[in-house]
Amino acid sequence: MGIPENLTCLLRNLYAGQEATVRTGHGTTDWFQIGRGARQVCILSPCLYNLYAEYIMRNAGLDEAQAGIKIARRNINNLRYADDTTLMAESEEELKSLLMKVKEESEKVGLKLNIQKTRILASGLITSWEIDGETVETVTDFIYLGSKITADGDCSPESKRRLLLGRKVVTNLDSILKSRDITLPTSVRLVKAMVLPVVMYGCESWTIKKAEHRRIDGFELQCWRRLLRVPWTARRSTKSILKETSPGCSLEGLMLKLKLQYFGRHWKRP
């Protein structure tokens, strides 16, 4: 890779015989050796992984490969974030070719493809894959960087999942939000800072249908009713709830703002 020997020797000595301990509420554990995996609190680990990943992708020829998906006149065949890598192609043959190239180049630098953590997502029919005698699992959806990706591209499962996660956060904060020691404006700010971002995560790419609009509006109203301790059985208009809480921009409005910002950034790209 062209890295001087003195630097590789320094890194090797840094990781050789590395030990760690875990501190808990009951004290610290015994020291144990770290054989492989992520080196906790090591600022070098992400840099080293990115260096290897870039080296593998370049040697695999992914930059010059014709396989991939055309987006805004650009050919994209791989997405990488930290240690998550996604390969994309328009056909099964192209995808398998990309995967085998990456696998071969990875083995040259001592990295092995973990079939147990590898998934295939296809929008159509696909044959069963076997690599080194192991079958690669084919799925209809999976979680990538915190968002659920489905084979049919439907955003409804992800929006429902996000609303469910938002409700869990509200439940966890229930004692704080209902505390009489916290003013209503502070509680509203807590919801906007800790609950709504959970729901809005990844919403820039959502296609929101009428049913989702109703669910989103219902979730937001449920949050404000909870702050005011107003049950659903109470005859209280939505307008009066919003007037008392004064949340400002609605949840749907915040989502629209994120969508426009996302669109604007891509529109300005050359």
Regions found by a protein language model. Name each.
Residues 1-257, 261, 269-270:
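Nucleotidyl polymerases of mobile genetic elements and RNA viruses
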